[in-house]
Amino acid sequence: MTEVISNKITAKDGATSLKDIDDKRWVWISDPETAFTKAWIKEDLPDKKYVVRYNNSRDEKIVGEDEIDPVNPAKFDRVNDMAELTYLNEPAVTYNLEQRYLSDQIYTYSGLFLVAVNPYCGLPIYTKDIIQLYKDKTQERKLPHVFAIADLAYNNLLENKENQSILVTGESGAGKTENTKRIIQYLAAIASSTTVGSSQVEEQIIKTNPVLESFGNARTVRNNNSSRFGKFIKVEFSLSGEISNAAIEWYLLEKSRVVHQNEFERNYHVFYQLLSGADTALKNKLLLTDNCNDYRYLKDSVHIIDGVDDKEEFKTLLAAFKTLGFDDKENFDLFNILSIILHMGNIDVGADRSGIARLLNPDEIDKLCHLLGVSPELFSQNLVRPRIKAGHEWVISARSQTQVISSIEALAKAIYERNFGWLVKRLNTSLNHSNAQSYFIGILDIAGFEIFEKNSFEQLCINYTNEKLQQFFNHHMFVLEQEEYMKEEIVWDFIDFGHDLQPTIDLIEKANPIGILSCLDEECVMPKATDATFTSKLDALWRNKSLKYKPFKFADQGFILTHYAADVPYSTEGWLEKNTDPLNENVAKLLAQSTNKHVATLFSDYQETETKTVRGRTKKGLFRTVAQRHKEQLNQLMNQFNSTQPHFIRCIVPNEEKKMHTFNRPLVLGQLRCNGVLEGIRITRAGFPNRLPFNDFRVRYEIMAHLPTGTYVESRRASVMILEELKIDEASYRIGVSKIFFKAGVLAELEERRVATLQRLMTMLQTRIRGFLQRKIFQKRLKDIQAIKLLQANLQVYNEFRTFPWAKLFFNLRPLLSSTQNDKQLKKRDAEIIELKYELKKQQNSKSEVERDLVETNNSLTAVENLLTTERAIALDKEEILRRTQERLANIEDSFSETKQQNENLQRESASLKQINNELESELLEKTSKVETLLSEQNELKEKLSLEEKDLLDTKGELESLRENNATVLSEKAEFNEQCKSLQETIVTKDAELDKLTKYISDYKTEIQEMRLTNQKMNEKSIQQEGSLSESLKRVKKLERENSTLISDVSILKQQKEELSVLKGVQELTINNLEEKVNYLEADVKQLPKLKKELESLNDKDQLYQLQATKNKELEAKVKECLNNIKSLTKELENKEEKCQNLSDASLKYIELQEIHENLLLKVSDLENYKKKYEGLQLDLEGLKDVDTNFQELSKKHRDLTFNHESLLRQSASYKEKLSLASSENKDLSNKVSSLTKQVNELSPKASKVPELERKITNLMHEYSQLGKTFEDEKRKALIASRDNEELRSLKSELESKRKLEVEYQKVLEEVKTTRSLRSEVTLLRNKVADHESIRSKLSEVEMKLVDTRKELNSALDSCKKREAEIHRLKEHRPSGKENNIPAVKTTEPVLKNIPQRKTIFDLQQRNANQALYENLKRDYDRLNLEKHNLEKQVNELKGAEVSPQPTGQSLQHVNLAHAIELKALKDQINSEKAKMFSVQVQYEKREQELQKRIASLEKVNKDSLIDVRALRDRIASLEDELRAA
């Protein structure tokens, strides 16, 4: 390491070594406080380690080779370009910037871009002398300065005829705005012209800075003059290099600052400048005071900034307004808006006891409305109790206190933002002076990267913009540069600097997968969406899927995003409101009608939406969120940058305390790392930043070489010959395919040599020209001498000739001859001059017109291009949404087909399992018969066993001992309960269940044979019978416990199924919401083919109705069979109880207990089967009623089949969801089969006896029946859900039809208005032709006809009222009385037929009455459905009250009696409820048919009314013709 450092220090590029000055070897080492510090190597250690001593200290430290960096020689201190440093490392770059900063040299070159450090003080480096200095110097001799970058951009624009851009970037408080001002100052100075108009443009461009700073800048924690908006200033230049125009584009105004400011910050400067600098007259006119504490939006902020006089700044603002051409009215309008905002913040809002808001200070409202130019009453009403549209009606909504306060704040922010936009537009109007073709230099000044204690939506947009700008810088500096090296095929190794910011940008803006802004836009249009739902949705999308995204500790409060500068925590509170930018439309419309023209102009878009209506509807534009608008503006800005040659200025914050001559090394080093400064220096030193095409290089520098003149030399070869002749080092340039690439500084050296060559050549040229001119002067003098001599000779001859008489005559006549010819020539020339002037003027006018047309076409073209880009962006968004929905639809259809196939397989399996179940039931019946034969045999043994009564007492003692052993059995029960809980997690599949049942049947047969053998042995061995009795009692108790546990397990499974059904409903809702979007997009395309499918679905539903009817009858028969079985079971239980009382023998008691146990099991299983069948019967009845109602509604709404297709799609989706759930249940069943078989194998040694096997068989059969029934129930629920969705779609279609009828009704009303206007014309005609009696008679006849039609209409209305009364009577009476009222309803139908066919305009009232009657009938229909639902609910409650008793094992006789009593009561209740249900169903069907007939008749009446309207139009037209004829 010693040799390496010494070599680096002594031999690098021939640099002067530190040893020439100092014998110490100086290095940089890291320091926790100052980032790095100087030290010198005291001793070399083995393993490449060193002992170093700190500078100005005796502290020593052992460091490794990787922990030190060499220090540059002293001659490189405060170097102008950091690319010239010998050792390029982070401490060296930071130290160079620090040394220059402390010596007030705030600008430093960093390769191809400029680094500017904020001095936090004024420096005399922007004067006119400095501007002239940089204007006169060549590029190589220019010291680092912002003027140098501006001059480079200007020269490139003139030489290359290419648009330029200067990106001033950096963190907040780094001095971006100040550097932007200096760039504009320099461009205005060097591009100035002698003409008055051009100088005025330059002055106006400079004066825009104080205006924009006053209205758009504010004090923040890090900057006293922070730009709270982004601006892109385009300075346009003519072809001659003079400033012709300027334009300003603005982005992301922080309008929330108007109403809220953080601690130690303040509002926009203009508020404080107005209160401090305005005179008394203006304040009185604006109703303002001098104190900032009088206004709520200012009193909590910092009022004064050190070193800034708001009063003087206000004078500067007024002077800028005057220079920019603002008149007094425009100035007053701007200040009036500021006063409006201040008064708006002083409105006090309270609430009454009911929570409704009320305004507490009417005086402040009067002031505000006076400034706004609106009525105080209307303003207060629209603010506190606005009118909102609920459906098709306008209602008054009472607002709460918080709603009114937020509405006021939103209005204040909107007014300030709109006023700022108007101000920028007005500035652009003042700066637009020429329409000629030009190039521009764009200067970007936008808010820097921001990290506050609480970062919201505004900070995300600002940081997203800076992320894009930083990516553009990295792409231009590192990627494009090296890509061009590769494209030109020069020798270069690609360097990856690791600055790929695309993952963070994709996380913010990408549409698929959905990013932050797209997710926010989706949540803004979702109903009942909140900030918490947005955050949770975003967390579900990106958690653990992107390294750039991290959740908050509390996930619903925000998230953390990794930017290029740092990790930023964002709080999502209020993001939905900020993105939608809500505004009280009632107040906005009121302001659009304001008497204050400026206020009305700001809200002119609400005035346009009020006037542009079509058929009574407001025509609104496409809704765009704040995120969408910002993303579009940012994309347009980046497109402009990509079409220009960029120049970069990286601004650096030296300290966070805003102190001069204070340099925080860790802070600056972090910014250098983030901004890519070090990488830019490295690529500048290693690469070839300057390049020229071969032809340009030859044209520019061939003057310095001697190329062959006789033959043609190709440009590439000529360029190489020039470089060889100029003796340029080959390592300093590379020859590409079409260009020559140079190291930094080489092209500047060539330029200097070219200038020297030109100077030498120009000197030679000057000498030759001067010699030529002197020779010309000498020759002229010789000619003058010869002319003088000739004149002298001629004068002598003239003197002699003058005395000759004829000569006098000749001299007198000669002028007279030539004057006449001269006059003619002069007149001819004057005429030609006049004609030429006329033609010139004509051509100038035509030229101006062409230029004007060209400007208009260019403006229209730019407008069309902007519109096209926005439309393309919208189309891309819609295409992306459509593509996602199509992909989801395709996936849904695929899964639907799979689940459909699985459902068919399940149905086949369920059929086979049902058959197996029937076989098992038959075998069980055979078993019961065999048991009865055994009982008969055991009755014969009663006499033989009478002698063993004494032994019974001993067995009772054994029973008591068995009770003591019950504790041990309970432990076994706990183990069995745990096993049952494990069985609850999975459900038995149908295929595995078949194998298991067959296995149990075979085991059961063997056990029956063993039971027979044990019964035979029972007579021989009484001692063994006593032991078996004790064992049987244990088993009975154990089985009873197992029965109770299994019943509890069944209840738990039911609860789990209910929870699954709830989850299914939630999933169905989400799927329905997604499918609605797909259906709305495809509804217009698939209308015609859907009609056929809908008709087929109607036929299928009719068939389904018939199948349900037959199934209903079958279920009723099964119910009867179950009741008969219950009766037989109760009789058998009574018989067994008598036998149990007569038993005095242990063996007989064992047999009776076994029989009772079997009967109890059968009874429980029968009860469960009966309940399931009864529930299935109820579901079938409900399904039949739903099918009937749906069938009738669909037949009635046959004209709206297109809307029903969407319900069918939802039905298929829900059915698919059910099938997928069934498939998941199928998988769970298969898992349970495996677990059950495993458990059975484990329990087989314990359950080797007959009772245990019987109990398990019955339990398994019971579970099988439950599973089959649950599967059927799920299918029925799926059908019911599909029908409910279908009903929902039908109701939506009815709503659409009602809306269409309302539209037609509005049309008819318009026609009525036209007829009324015709009547007025008729009255005028009567006055004019009053003498004609025939017209009067005709009019009287028409009036008589109108009276007749009114009478007819009244009679029709009376009939409608009678119908309504009958309908109310139907609702009030019970079902028995409803049948008697049916004929009365039918008798009213001929009344409609008896109405005369002659119709008038008043038939419209009849049509409205019919419509009302139709709605009343619909309400009655819904009420009947509610009654039906209540009856069904009562039946379900009765059913739920039936709780089957559980045997305890202590008193079997009481349990059997209780079961018999409950079964009997249950039987009576079921019969009564069944009778009620059948009667209600019959009455419901009759009543439903009557209502449908009435609805059909009303529809006919509506059709007739439409026909009558058309006839009425024809009659009106005929009357008009008659009147015209008269």
From Swiss-Prot:
Residues 875-1244 form a coiled coil. Residues 22-73 form the Myosin N-terminal SH3-like domain. Keywords: Actin-binding, ATP-binding, Calmodulin-binding, Coiled coil, Motor protein, Myosin, Nucleotide-binding, Phosphoprotein. ATP binds at G170, E171, S172, G173, A174, G175, K176, T177. It comes from the Eukaryota. One of its GO terms (cellular component) is cytoplasm. Residues 758-787 form the IQ domain. Residues 77-755 form the Myosin motor domain. The modification Phosphoserine is found at S1044. Residues 634-656, 734-748 are annotated as: Actin-binding. SMART domains: MYSc (SM00242). GO terms for biological process: mitotic actomyosin contractile ring assembly; mitotic actomyosin contractile ring contraction; mitotic cytokinesis. CDD domains: MYSc_class_II (cd01377). InterPro entries: Kinesin_motor_dom_sf, Myosin_head_motor_dom-like, Myosin_N, Myosin_S1_N, P-loop_NTPase. One of its GO terms (molecular function) is actin filament binding. Required for cell division. It is a component of the cdc12 'spot', a structure thought to mark the site of septation. May work in conjunction with myo3. PANTHER family: MYOSIN, MYOSIN-11. Binds to cdc4 and rlc1. Belongs to the TRAFAC class myosin-kinesin ATPase superfamily. Myosin family. This is Myosin type-2 heavy chain 1. It comes from Schizosaccharomyces pombe (strain 972 / ATCC 24843) (Fission yeast).
